[in-house]
Curated annotation (Swiss-Prot):
Residue stretches spanning the membrane: none
Protein name: Glutamate rich 3
Gene this chain is encoded by: Erich3
Keywords on record: Cell projection, Cytoplasm
Biased composition annotated in UniProt, kind: Acidic residues: 500-523, 558-572
The keyword RNA-binding appears for this protein: no
Species whose genome carries this gene: Mus musculus (Mouse)
Organism lineage string: Eukaryota, Metazoa, Chordata, Craniata, Vertebrata
């Protein structure tokens, strides 16, 4: 086929005509394909394009036509079907209408007849005539049966009609029409009843009823119905008919199941039960009685149903087509039910099971006989199972499978012999019985060898069925009053006549030959054995049959002598049956090894007799006639019974008495005495002496065979005249008058008698031991019990000793052997039932009470609980103690009254550990139910209750709050972190009051009442400080929400008072620290710079929080300023510090670690570490204990040197910790940086600034700002010159004095702290606070949120320290709050420049972890572009921070990315998230002015530094914010701050590359980055370290400038703050632009 191509040869090319492809297309397969495709014809001609298209069109048309035809046919069929349905409906309507008409006509005619026939037909008057001329009674009598609605005869019991005037009518008509009454109405009524039970239904049933009523009316016209309203009419028995008679007998046959063997054919009745004059035919149905069990459902869904029974229906397909319901009923689980199978012969046995109308199982098998074994249908989860199948005959398939069709020739002689033996006269049988018993031991020895083979022949199922048959036969023998012989002979005759008489003897018959061979070998081995196996079998069988014959007479004589009633006889036989079952439960215990083969001597015969006892059941089984195949044990049982009776008859009344006593569990000693009195013969005496000697020796030796030999010797000594049966051994008196009794069975009573007989003088203990030994030996030897001892189960009798009085208590007999061993019997010799039922292990652990009874509660108590919980003095356990959780009990002491309050028990363990119990020993439910996080954030009120809003306080807040003076632990104090508690001890000085949790909460509460959200933030700061583990949780919390949650409403005046009191102490501390700081001013300043860089994270976060606060709550800030102005600087410093700490919350969780040395970590380099140590000495004074505690986490931010320095700090902090926790916060450079950020936040919240605590915090944040400004100015200095930096420093100095003045206005303490902070940070706290306030309004962040942010920043510093512990490799770049997410200083990590480089690498790793990506650390690497890192930071920020912060973080990252590639290089790449974050963090503290300066144009290559004018504006704005927050200036400052943050990113990267020496510049940049990041995440705060590396690179000139005079720093700070406000605005604008982009 040609294909269209552009032009040339390709346009006309046809592959089919290409000669080069001729060979290809000549391929048969290809040609077939082309032919199918229609490209060539059958002849091979290639079709043209036109022909091909025509052919395709034709094919498509044909396909379309076919589809149309199919559619038409389909619709036609639908129309036809619809029409057909309409026709059917119309016909049905017609039929129904006709039927309705006919019914109406019939009813009309019948009414007419009923009304007129009585009038037309003459009959005696039945009563007063009505106007219509018929009897009222007659009308009433016939009205009910003629109604169509009652398909029951009018004689039914429901028709209660009073006999009105019946006597005269009945008297006259009974004589004349009595026969009609009997044959007419009653039979038909009964017929109707039987038919109504299974109505055919519908029209046919109604017509049948109608016809019947018509006929009955005609026949009963001349008589009234025979009505008796008080009796149910019973129709007379119909005339016997052949069919009916057979049916009745067949139905009764299964009820007489005990009279017939199980394998009897179902269709045939025993001959004696049938009438020989009639010919019977086999029933078509199997009529097998099937017993099943309903196991129940696995899942029960309907619990509201009162009736828990399930409806069961079983249908049987009895003849191949029709289903018949053979069972229907409601059953509970484990219920058994019976039904009769109606399977027709030749059809399979098929059942369908329905459970509540749902088919659940089906079975189909050849016949019922196949299911004779107990099986569960459907596996483990089946609903039904077979219990037994009776009257089931095997089908041909089963007969062939079981081999029943092959009958050995030996079976018939056996049957004949059995019948002959039974027919022998009793005298001969008795004579032979004696001889056979003498020879029985040798024969039984032979049979013992055969038992193994014979036992295999009998399956467990056959044994069970055999036991059933035995029981049935014995019961029938008693019930029918027939002799055992007659019953057995009838059974034998029936068995001979049945074709499947050997259902259970198949294996036995197959092994007959093997048994004969074994017998021959046994005879050869026996010394005295000369008989052939057949003779021995005959000998064994003859005595058995004779025993049966004589047993009948003996049985009668026994009844006469003992006067036993039939009921007693039944009881005995039942007991014997049980004993036989028990003996069969231990089939064929081999004892031939213990038996001797000698037969000559009497003593030897006795030993053989012992073995014969054990093998009696075996012999009987082996010798069971094939005629009774399914009675393997029945003969044995019967033989035992007969032998017992014969023995009793020959021995006289004494033997009968003995056996009766044993059967009834009488005293065995009485029987022994009777025997000893009745028998006094020489041989027995000799035997008794021998027995006694041997038994004495064996007893002394402790041999188990004592009992056996005793029995053997006794048997040998007995005279032949003494009838010794195989199972009932004779008894001979010994010389001392004691009759040693042989233990023929595993009978405890017999064993006891033997022991008593052997040694009457021995102690009961020895007897008991010997008895136990004899019991074990008897169990091994003989599992069958003697007839007279059959009442006691063999095992039970052995294990339960008889009492001194010779009686065995039933409860003792039922006691488990192991239990008996462990549980001693009481003194009275009886075992208490409760002791018997008690678990052995429990009894071992739980002592029996003095009264010998166990308390149920002790028995039920868990052992472990008993061990842990001591019993009360009264010896009883309290249920509540027993139920108490062990772990809870360990932690919760019991009350004085010894009881545990439920509410205490239910209290969470962790909560109980943190929250002390009230003085009354009870825990308030609200405390127990309070969310852990809620409790951590909210301190308890003075009344000891929690305010819901305070319940959300972070757990970390609870950890840092100390106990109150009253000794009770407020939940927030109780939850104080252990490390914090250790580092910040509870001091009597105002530590608890001034603690962030205590005083700051109070001040926060007060300010919150007045609308000061910053106090709320302070609460959060506490929460954050204590619960820094909740990463960024507070950051994520909306400002308003945080304020609401963290705020504790207190009046401003109260907060003021508290803070003033605390500020006094803090002022003293601050003064002391300031002096220390002066000593190490420059070193401290450098350390401050570095520490500020480390703390710059916090400052950034704080500034970021401040920005957010200002944006969210500009108005609130004004109110807070107003409210906060009254507060002392120290108070607000505390509160703001707390606020910062709270905002830094997670960071301050590291606070304790900072105290330990986290501040050292803040310092980037060794030099920084050293300086920072000095600074730490100063810092602890200004910083609050909480800050100090928070500082330990900062320690980990930096390198190990920082940690060391932190250790030094810890020493200093320890000193200052008790006095001023918040002061320490303000003092620490890192914390001061954080505090600076916080103060910026506080600027956002003017009240904080106004208060003394605000001054402190402002001092810290402003110091950070100063450092940031210095850093930025240093950056400018690098770019523009150091002169500009000097100017900025001067501005910082100027601003710092202003702040100091403001602090002094607020409170002298605040001024002192400001002075210290100014020295440390060289940044006026006032201006810094203004910067914070300005930055905050821009972001619209509520004061609380801003404080939370500031706290987060602070935490950024501190937390990095904390995290640096856990995440030391990650560095401080990441905080628990998620600040570290954005801040993972990559460049420093890659550079590994000093401690800061190392710290930066750690921060990068932490950032990677925070980002949950393996690339996190790589982002921190130099290779990764800043953009990727920025994206990571964004993700981290988004995960942990609010939208504003995320946005800022993104912007910062973006700017950092832009800046880093331009100005920084690979280090900038490293900087991305971590460095940028770090720089942002460090610079955020200084964002007010330094950010603007450090901020690079995101799009520009160089770092944009805010002009001096901008700085001145920023300073002015900060000052104005310090006095009155200006939203515009704050916005501008924030924008500038953001711009500065972007620049700071670039600068931070550049500086980090340049070196890590300049900690201040790095801190500044970090502050810028932090503030930007703080908007994004406080995680960036931790990455301050990366910026620190940049700051170091930026030059130590910045650090030197930063560490310059305080005046220069202050002046630079003022400028920086001005620039920061402008830069914040610019930065925010750039952020907004980027967001819009």
């Amino acid at each position: 086929m040609s294909h269209s191509h552009p032009a040339g040869l390709l346009a006309t090319y046809n592959s089919l005509t290409d000669k080069h492809l001729a060979g290809y297309f000549n391929n048969t397969r290809i040609r077939r394909h082309l032919l199918r495709s229609g490209l060539i014809t059958r002849s091979g001609r290639i079709l043209s394009e036109k022909e091909y298209k025509v052919n395709n069109m034709k094919q498509d048309h044909q396909k379309y036509i076919r589809e149309c035809l199919a559619r038409a046919i389909f619709h036609k069929v639908l129309d036809m079907e619809r029409y057909h349905q309409l026709e059917i409906k119309r016909k049905l309507d017609t039929l129904a209408r006709k039927e309705r008409i006919q019914r109406l006509k019939g009813e009309h005619t019948r009414r007419f007849i009923e009304d007129n026939m009585p009038v037309l037909t003459p009959h005696p008057p039945a009563g007063p005539k009505t106007n219509r001329g018929h009897s009222v009674l007659a009308e009433e009598g016939r009205s009910s049966p003629l109604t169509l609605t009652a398909p029951r005869p009018y004689t039914a019991p429901g028709n209660m009609q009073p006999p009105v005037r019946l006597q005269p009518l009945l008297s006259s008509r009974q004589t004349r029409n009595g026969s009609k009454i009997t044959s007419g109405s009653k039979p038909k009524g009964s017929l109707l009843e039987s038919e109504a039970l299974f109505p055919l239904g519908g029209k046919k049933a109604m017509m049948k009823f109608r016809n019947y009523m018509d006929h009955s009316q005609k026949e009963d016209l001349y008589q009234l119905p025979h009505i008796n309203s008080y009796h149910t009419p019973v129709p007379p028995t119909p005339q016997p008919q052949a069919g009916k008679n057979f049916r009745d007998k067949r139905l009764e046959s299964w009820r007489r199941k005990r009279l017939r063997p199980i394998t009897a054919p179902n269709g045939l009745e025993p001959l004696f039960a049938k009438d020989p004059g009639r010919i019977y035919k086999t029933a078509p149905h199997s009529n097998a009685v099937i017993t099943m069990v309903y196991f129940g459902k696995n899942v029960h869904l309907s619990y509201d149903d009162i009736d828990f029974r399930d409806e069961i229906k079983i249908y049987q397909q009895h003849c191949g087509g029709e289903n018949l319901c053979v069972y229907k009923g409601k059953l509970l689980e484990k219920d058994t039910f019976q039904f009769i199978s109606k399977r027709h012969h030749g059809f399979p046995f098929s059942l369908t099971f329905f459970l509540n109308g749902i088919q659940v199982n089906r079975i189909s098998s050849c016949c019922e006989f196949k299911h004779r074994r107990s099986t569960r249908l459907g596996g483990k989860r089946g609903y039904f199972g077979f219990v037994c199948v009776e009257k089931a005959s095997p089908c041909y398939r089963c007969i062939i499978a079981m081999g029943l069709d092959r009958k050995p020739s030996s079976t018939k002689p056996k049957k004949e012999k059995i019948t002959e033996k039974k027919e022998e006269p009793p005298n001969k049988s008795q004579g032979k019985l004696r001889k056979d018993r003498m020879n029985a031991p040798s024969k039984r020895n032979e049979m013992e060898r055969k038992e193994s083979c014979v036992s295999a022949a009998f399956s467990a199922e056959e044994i069970k069925l055999g036991v059933k048959e035995v029981r049935t036969a014995i019961e029938e023998m008693e019930w029918k009053g027939k002799s055992g012989r007659d019953v057995w002979e009838e059974d034998q005759d029936n068995a001979v006549k049945y074709d499947y008489e050997e259902d259970f003897e198949v294996d036995d018959e197959k092994q007959d030959e093997k048994v004969d061979e074994d017998e021959d070998q046994a005879d050869d081995q026996m010394s005295g054995g000369s008989k052939t196996p057949t003779e021995s079998e005959k000998d064994n069988r003859n005595p058995e049959k004779k025993i049966e014959t004589s047993s009948e007479k003996a049985h009668d004589s026994e009844n006469e002598d003992t006067g036993c009633s039939d009921s007693e006889e039944d009881d005995r036989q039942d007991v014997k049956t049980m004993s036989s079952i028990s003996s069969r439960s231990h089939p064929y215990s081999s004892e031939s090894e213990d038996d001797s083969t000698e037969v000559g001597g009497e003593a030897d015969s006795v030993s053989e007799e012992g073995s014969s006892r054990s093998s009696s059941s075996q012999d009987l089984r082996e010798n069971d006639d094939p005629g009774k195949p399914h009675f393997p044990i029945e003969k044995y049982l019967e033989t035992e019974i007969e032998e017992q009776e014969i023995t009793e008859g020959h021995n006289g009344p004494w033997l009968t008495e003995l056996s009766g006593m044993h059967v009834t569990e009488g005293k065995p000693t009485m029987g022994i005495q009777a025997l000893s009195e009745s028998e006094h013969k020489e041989p027995r005496r000799v035997a008794s002496s021998e027995v006694r000697a041997k038994s004495q020796l064996q007893k002394e030796a402790g041999l188990p065979g004592v009992e056996e030999e005793v029995g053997q010797i006794t048997g040998g000594a007995q005279e032949p005249g003494h009838c010794c049966s195989n199972t009932a051994p004779g008894l001979s008196p010994t010389d001392d008058g004691v009759t040693p009794m042989r233990k023929p069975e595993v009978n405890l009573g017999r064993g006891t008698e033997e022991r008593a007989a052997i040694s009457a003088n021995e102690q009961p203990e020895q007897d008991a031991q010997e008895m136990h030994t004899l019991k074990e030996e008897a169990m091994k030897k003989d599992e069958s019990s003697q007839p007279e001892d059959t009442d006691a189960h063999a095992g039970v009798r052995e294990e339960s000793g008889m009492q001194k009085d010779g009686t065995c208590h039933p409860q003792d007999a039922g006691i488990d052997v192991e239990l008996r061993e462990r549980v001693d019997m009481q003194e009275d010799g009886t075992c208490h039932p409760q002791g018997a039922d008690m678990d052995v292990g429990l009894k071992e652990r739980v002592g029996v009470q003095e009264d010998g009874t166990h308390y149920p509660q002790d028995a039920d108590m868990d052992v472990g609980l008993r061990e842990r919980v001591g019993m009360q003095e009264d010896g009883t356990h309290h249920s509540q103690d027993a139920d108490m959780d062990v772990e809870l009990k360990e932690r919760v002491g019991m009350q004085e009254d010894g009881t545990c309050h439920p509410q205490d028990a239910n209290m969470d363990v962790e909560l109980k550990e943190r929250v002390g119990m009230q003085e009354d020993g009870t825990c308030h439910p609200q405390d127990a139910d309070m969310d852990v996080e809620l409790e951590e954030r909210t301190g308890m009120q003075e009344d000891g209750t929690h305010h819901p809003q305070g319940a959300d306080v972070d757990l970390g807040l609870r950890e840092r709050a100390g106990m109150q003076e009253d000794g009770t632990c407020y939940p927030q104090n109780a939850n104080m972190d252990v490390g914090l508690r250790e580092k910040a001890g509870i001091s009597e000085v105002l530590l608890g009051e001034r603690s962030p949790t205590g005083v700051l909460l109070a001040s926060a509460e007060q300010s919150t009442e007045k609308g000061e959200c910053y106090l709320n933030i302070a609460s959060e700061a506490e929460a954050g400080t204590e619960g820094s583990s909740r990463h960024g949780e507070e950051q994520l919390i909306p400002t308003g929400k945080v304020a609401a949650e963290g705020s504790v409403f207190l009046s401003v005046e109260q907060a003021r008072d508290r803070q003033k009191d605390e500020d006094l102490d803090r002022q003293a501390l601050l003064q002391t620290q300031m002096e220390k700081e002066r000593a190490v001013s420059e070193a401290g300043q450098e350390l401050k710079a570095e520490f500020t860089d480390s703390g710059g994270l916090n400052s950034e976060t704080l500034e970021e929080a401040a920005v957010l606060k200002e944006v969210g709550t500009s108005e609130v800030k004004e109110a807070e300023r107003e409210v906060g102005s009254p507060k002392t600087d120290g108070d607000q410093g505390e509160e703001e510090a707390l606020t910062e700490l709270e905002v830094v919350g997670p960071v301050e969780d590291t606070g304790p670690e900072r105290k330990a040395g986290s501040e050292e970590t803040v310092l980037g380099g060794e030099r920084a570490a050293t300086e920072r140590k000095d600074f730490l000495e100063e810092a602890p004074i200004s910083a609050s204990t909480g800050e100090v505690q928070a500082s330990p986490r900062e320690v980990f931010r930096g390198n190990h040197e920082l940690c060391k320095e932190d250790t030094a700090r810890e020493g200093v902090i320890a000193d200052t910790e008790s006095t001023a926790e918040q002061d320490l916060r303000a003092v620490f450079p890192g914390e001061l940086a954080a505090a600076g950020g916080i103060e910026k936040v506080e600027r956002l919240t003017p009240p904080l600034r106004e208060t003394g605590s605000e001054r402190e915090e402002e001092t810290g944040p402003e110091v950070l700002k100063t450092e940031d400004l210095l850093g930025e100015q240093k950056v400018k200095g690098e770019e523009e010159g150091t002169a500009k930096e000097v100017g900025s420093e001067e501005e910082d100095r100027a601003s710092r004095p202003e702040m100091e003045a403001h602090a002094k206005d607020v409170e002298p303490t605040g001024a002192t702290e400001l002075g210290e902070a100014t020295k440390l940070l060289e940044d006026p706290p006032k201006e810094r606070a203004i910067t914070l306030s300005e930055a905050t309004p821009q972001f619209g962040k509520s004061p609380k949120e801003s404080e939370a942010t500031a706290t987060e920043h602070k935490g950024g510093e501190e937390l990095p320290g904390q995290e640096s512990k856990a995440l030391w490799p990650q560095g401080r770049g990441l905080s628990h709050d998620g600040e570290g997410l954005l801040g993972a200083p990559g460049p420093e990590a890659d550079k590994a420049q000093g401690p800061e480089g190392f710290f930066t690498a750690r921060c990068e790793e932490w950032a990677a972890k925070e980002l949950d990506s393996s690339a996190g650390s790589e982002r921190l690497e130099e290779d990764q572009p800043l953009q990727a890192q920025r994206e990571d930071i964004q993700r981290m920020t988004q995960g942990n921070l609010s939208g504003e912060r995320l946005t800022r973080a993104v912007v910062v990252c973006g700017e950092a990315k832009a800046e880093n590639p331009q100005g920084e290089g690979s280090e900038d790449k490293e900087c991305p998230p971590g460095t940028v974050t770090g720089s942002l963090t460090g610079q955020n503290w200084n964002m007010g002015g330094n950010i603007v300066e450090a901020e690079e144009d995101p799009h520009g290559g160089g770092i944009e530094e805010p002009t001096a004018e901008q700085k001145e504006e920023e300073s002015a704005e900060s000052k104005s914010a310090d006095g009155i927050p200006e939203a515009s200036s704050a916005a501008n400052a924030q924008k500038e701050t953001w711009d500065g943050a972007g620049e700071a990113l670039g600068e931070a990267a550049a500086e980090e590359r340049t070196g890590t020496e300049d900690m201040a510049p790095r801190t500044e940049k970090v502050a810028v980055v932090e503030e930007v990041t703080s908007a994004g995440a406080m995680v960036e705060t931790e990455q301050e370290q990366a910026p620190e590396a940049q700051d170091r690179e930026g030059g130590e000139t910045k650090a030197s400038r930063h560490t310059g005079t305080a005046g220069e720093d202050t002046g630079s700070t003022g400028k920086d703050e001005e620039h920061q406000s402008g830069a914040a605005e610019e930065f925010r604008e750039s952020v907004s632009q980027r967001e819009t982009a």
